[in-house]
Amino acid sequence: MTMLNLRYRSLWREPLGDYDVVYCFLSPAPMAELWAKARREMRPGSLLVSNSFPIEGVTPDAVIEVPDRRRTRLYLYRPAGPAPKLRTTAWAPRPAA
């Protein structure tokens, strides 16, 4: 079973709803347009990761500071909100008879 599938595609032509994680390293100029597209197309729980450039006017869900020579920051966003919570029930093994 493949757990990771990397694709190099145009963010503008590709439907983003097919992906759990979308990673971009763009200039600040197109970020607002990408944010609008991600909000329209991505599913709840999906992650948009922007390398080095935050989306103006949008608070990231998290920021990761990479310990490299550039002091890279990864800005993490959930455009469609968090994943829905699953209903769970408590389970415990039966005691030995």
Report residues per predicted region:
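C-terminal substrate-binding/active-site "lid" region of AdoMet-derived donor-dependent transferases
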Residues: 29-97
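Sequence-level detector for tyrosine residue identity
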Residues: 8, 19, 23, 75-77
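S-adenosyl-L-methionine
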Residues: 1-18
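Short SAM/SAH-binding signature in class I
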Residues: 16-33
